[in-house]
Amino acid sequence: MPVKKSKQDPRSKSVSNLRKINPSGKREESFFELVYEVARQIPYGRVTSYGAIAACLGTKLSARMVGWAMNGADKINPTVPAHRVVNRVGLLSGKHHFKPPGKMEKLLRKEGILVKDDVIVNFKEKFWDPGTEFL
């Protein structure tokens, strides 16, 4: 008999459902949940990169996994400011995950971040390093 697949999107689970229980019975946060916790600390008007979040979590080579986490961030509660996470040169590489088109850039501009041709103009000035500036 075939297994019936759930129609619920796994990314729509609340943050509390993202925790695992380890053998000792303690709750353990998932990688995605840790990413969301770091992203929530990004100050208004600042941005960081996927790689900077990965490095802050001690997984320097996991920038793509941070990107995957950001792809589903719009379904997480409390909210995650995914628009503040860009690639290592300030490119809005995740912009196609925002609806309607242009929403990521609009949110950044609203926070005083200049964007030209999908790249943050003042990236070095606006960059927030969670490894050294974590709130």
Tell me what each language-model feature is.
Residues 2-135:
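Nucleic acid-binding interface residues in structured DNA/RNA-binding domains
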